[in-house]
From Swiss-Prot:
Name the UniProt record assigns to this protein: Succinate--CoA ligase [GDP-forming] subunit beta, mitochondrial
Organism lineage string: Eukaryota, Amoebozoa, Evosea, Eumycetozoa, Dictyostelia
Organism domain of life: Eukaryota
Other comments on record: This protein may be expected to contain an N-terminal transit peptide but none has been predicted.
Subunit record text: Heterodimer of an alpha and a beta subunit. The beta subunit determines specificity for GTP.
């Protein structure tokens, strides 16, 4: 699991997020896609092949040497300990020695839904499997480069405790987490990579190799507009090589206009279709597991809304930020997305009108309710610019809309709707 996913799991101390399924304005790649990118920048990886049909596994295996590792390709961690819904087959990562074994393993995985600690209970459908040459690591280390607001730019993070849950290392032995902030203008300095290589236990020629790998990973990070390049394990092998065995690379969506080749690798089948649809209309949507649908303007207000719903005994079904200048069409599309979720039994709209005027939102709510044929309770709290006009529009709409005086009142009314 990534050291940097934890912030996506808790909001206000009460809501747990699923990092594999929730939109965080980053593009995620499959492991084989990340390896392809690393190969381009001179980063040492195992030789690998990817297959989408089990019948191709024997040929792919023949192009590789020695023992093979067969890995299901999904955007989720914990694959090795996962299981497949359809057959109960255990593990999305296996070792094998022959092409025939690889074919059997691919047949067990392809087209099946893999459930891990980072997926929903429905799992994620495996549509590709990577075969790679197995590496015998002498030491498994950890290395990452991430954008960190605390440092105002990229920072290298390393630990001699790799190949395991790095979050546990950070919690239990924080003294084994080493950081080196990078000046975004001057770039990475040799003394920084030398310092980290030494702290990771590299000496002599191996230290120079490790330093070069860190430099190559930084070039990948900076030239491809990555927000995170995480290598776990960053391994020293028994034959003296330094290999990046597993990688997680994220990219800022804002860089899509100049990283077209990378963004063409996006696998929307791995994403919540509601999130994909919301993105088309500039809506920031994250699906959760509750039954109170939320539509709010502003990320902070949206999180506060979810927290208060939870505190009042309800469970939010989503995070949905319509932004500061959403159109009536965007509001309508937001309603369509929310009402497509069969778990949603009540909608709560919480708008603080600044740039976005309350009368515009009110008109959008009325039109959206009519278009989708809304049949579930709707609670609306409006405040700010043109609030009185907005409330009047709602009152004259003839729709079954419950107005709330403030956020606390709105949360209570939404929760009470579910008790009727």
């Amino acid at each position: 699991m990534s050291l940097f996913n934890s912030a996506n799991k808790v909001i206000g101390g009460v809501l747990k997020f699923n990092p594999s399924k929730y939109q965080v304005r980053y593009l995620n790649l499959h492991e084989y896609q990340s390896k392809s990118l690393m190969d381009k920048y001179g980063v040492n990886t195992q030789k690998w092949r990817v297959v989408t049909k089990a019948s191709d596994a024997i040929k792919a295996a023949s192009e590789l040497n020695g023992e093979l590792v067969v890995k299901a390709q999904v955007h989720a961690g914990g694959r090795g300990k996962g299981s497949f819904i359809e057959t109960g087959f255990k593990g999305g990562v296996h070792l094998c020695k022959t092409g025939k074994e690889a074919e059997r393993l691919c047949d067990e995985m392809l087209g099946k839904h893999l459930v891990t600690k980072q997926t929903t209970k429905e799992g994620t459908k495996v549509q590709s499997v990577m075969l790679a040459e197995s590496v015998d690591p002498k030491r498994e280390l950890y290395f990452a480069i991430v954008m960190d607001r605390k440092y105002g730019g990229p920072v290298m993070i390393a630990s001699p405790q790799g190949g395991v849950d790095i979050e546990s290392v950070a919690e239990e032995t924080p003294d084994l987490i080493f950081k080196e902030p990078i000046d975004i203008v001057k770039g990475i300095r040799p003394e920084q990579t030398k310092n980290l290589a030494e702290k990771l236990g590299f000496t002599g020629e191996k230290a120079k190799i490790a330093q070069q790998q860190m430099e190559n990973l930084y070039q990948l990070f900076i030239k491809s507009d990555a927000t995170q390049v995480e290598i776990n394990p960053f391994a020293e092998t028994t034959d003296g090589q330094v290999i990046c065995m597993d990688a997680k690379i994220n990219f800022d969506d804002n860089a899509s206009f100049r990283q077209k080749e990378i963004f063409e690798m996006r696998d929307t089948a791995e994403e919540d279709p509601r999130e994909v649809e919301a993105g088309k209309f500039g809506l920031n949507y994250i699906g959760l597991d509750g039954n109170i649908g939320c539509m709010v303007n502003g990320a902070g207000l949206a999180m506060a809304t979810m927290d208060i719903i939870k505190l009042k005994g309800g469970i939010p079904a989503n995070f949905l930020d319509v932004g500061g200048s959403a159109s009536e069409q965007a509001v309508t599309e937001a309603f369509k997305i929310l009402t497509k979720d069969p778990r949603v039994k009540c909608l709560l709209v919480n708008i603080f009108g600044g740039i976005m005027k309350c009368d515009i939102i009110a008109s959008g709510i009325v039109n959206a309710s009519k278009q989708v044929g809304l049949k579930i309770p709707l609670v609306v709290r409006l405040e700010g610019t043109n609030v009185n006009i907005g409330k009047e529009i709602l009152e004259k709409s003839g729709l079954n809309i419950t107005s709330a005086s403030d956020l606390d009142d709105a949360a209570i009314k939404a929760v009470n709707c579910l008790k009727k």
